[in-house]
Amino acid sequence: MGGGLVKKNLVLSVSIFAVVLLFSINSSYAARETIRITCWEGYADAAMVKQFKSLVKKKYKIVVDVKASYPKDQDEFYKAAKDGTADLISPPADVAKTPRFYCFQEGNFLLAEVDLKNIPNAKNLIPFFAADKSLTHQEKRYGLPYNCGPYGLDYNTAIVKEAPKSWNIFWDPQYKGKYTINNNFPKCNIWITALALGYKYDQIFDIEKLDRAKIQEKLNVLAQNAKSLWDGSANPDEFPQLALATDWGFAAAQANKKGGKWLIAAPKEGGTAWIDYWCITQAAKGTKKKLCEEWINLQLSPKAQAAVVKNQGVSPVVNNVGKLVTATEKNLFHVGDNAYFETVAIWQVMSEKTEKAFGEMWEEAKKLRQK
């Protein structure tokens, strides 16, 4: 009897070991997926990635790895889509239809149509953004808005006591050497220079409607008197030394987290604004594409859109964030304010001639910084 008991215990032990071993093997071979994201820095932060991984594991029983890369220029979004090195990209709205970046060549679409059934949070888009056709082609949608912000006029309230009323403050001699402006989006500086000269929204996106020589003269001064030029995003560590800055909103938000007192002005001439989209490239197929749609849906959730305000210093695109932000944030970043977005000039696709001219004008202006 004793020997039988030992045998039974031995069999039981072996069985338990086998079950544990089998479970371990199955766990090690659990479904895995990698999502490659090319996006502006901050759009795939650690908190968002952690939340996404948890969601995917719970909903799909998939262990997902997120590999993010951060471009400095918009051409990197096009290259990532063209080369298939990213599954998700976050380009400005006008990129996909800009001639040199065109993503809808017959027989060679670089982007995948999004399935709105998998992105239920899209129903909360503010009407202005829901109606935007930037990423619509042949009545099909190839992306969804994520956030919106200005090429804004930021001012340091510790130095500039009253809110600037005009873009012309950049040409005020007292601020020579005390401001920073963008370098790698030449069009933005031509736009604000044109607005400062009195041109209207329906003129600034077309070189044929502008006096090139007149704008060049003023642009030269803007470039020459800047303390610095920034690529990608302005450097918040430089902000304590500055009185003024152009900014997407990100740098001012970061500077304020470090004790800065920066605000965004509302120039009387108006201003331009970008919309960044989430787009899925043709590289994402099957389950990978569905996981990309889950990412977009998560990014349109109230919590993620509130983070757009608090972490990025720009505007959310949905209408259900109001309770998650302060009254000051709601006012400053026009949270849920559809009427406001109707008043700004959203970046438009420009002709190759205009793009080329603006690039040449900026390079000419920068030459004066070297003298």
Give the ranges of each region predicted by the language model.
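Short beta-strand->loop
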Residues: 110-123, 143, 260-272, 282-284
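C-terminal capping/gating helix-and-loop segments adjacent to ligand/active sites or protein-protein/ligand interfaces
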Residues: 306-371
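A ligand-binding cleft/hinge motif common to bilobed small-molecule-binding domains
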Residues: 94-101, 244-261
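A bilobed periplasmic-binding-protein/Venus flytrap-type ligand-binding module shared by bacterial periplasmic
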Residues: 152-159, 194-195, 275-288, 307-311
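Extracytoplasmic ligand-binding site segments that recognize negatively charged/polar headgroups
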Residues: 44-46, 90-236
